[in-house]
Curated annotation (Swiss-Prot):
Source taxon at top rank: Bacteria
Family: Belongs to the universal ribosomal protein uL16 family.
NCBIfam families in the record: rplP_bact
Pfam (any one): Ribosomal_L16
Name by which UniProt lists this protein: Large ribosomal subunit protein uL16
UniProt KW Zinc keyword: no
PROSITE patterns: RIBOSOMAL_L16_1, RIBOSOMAL_L16_2
Gene transcribed to yield this protein: rplP
Biological-process GO terms, alphabetical: translation
Organism whose genome encodes this protein: Geobacter metallireducens (strain ATCC 53774 / DSM 7210 / GS-15)
Length: 140
């Protein structure tokens, strides 16, 4: 699973997800992409599950780029622990996704295969998504 090698601070505040994605909102590598239409936290396990779903569908054809990285630590307290006594220890890693962010890119396959692969991947993700392609001018 994806996670940073090392971080400056072990714990982060929750933060707010306002506005649209300023960076990473256009296709950079592939011909087709999966773009977020909602904001949310995408867990490292969900990123991997979506990648596996796409890879299995396209078999050995094409290339996939993951355009998000989970760099925000989520903390949790042990079960049956009373409130207080400080913040819990880091438990998992998430990527903060805003509307417009390109999550995955793909090339080397037909549009029908890419569309279906991204549909399978989108079912694994907690945010709404849409299919975009380079030739259609990013609208689909």
């Amino acid at each position: 699973m994806l996670m940073p090698k090392r971080v400056k601070y072990r714990k982060q505040m929750k933060g707010r997800m306002t506005g649209a994605a300023m960076r990473g909102a256009t296709l950079s590598y592939g011909d087709f992409g999966l773009q977020a239409t909602e904001c949310g936290w995408v867990d490292s396990r969900q990123i991997e599950a979506a990648r596996i779903a796409m890879t299995r569908y396209i078999k050995r054809g094409g290339k996939i780029w993951i355009r998000m990285f989970p760099d925000k630590p989520l903390t949790s307290k042990p079960a049956e622990t009373r409130m207080g006594k400080g913040k819990g220890s880091p438990d998992s890693w998430v990527c903060v996704v805003k509307p417009g962010k390109v999550l995955y890119e793909m090339e080397g396959v037909s549009e029908e295969i890419a569309r279906e692969a991204f549909r399978l991947a989108a079912n694994k993700l907690p945010v709404g998504t849409k299919f975009i392609s380079r030739k259609e001018g990013y609208e689909s």
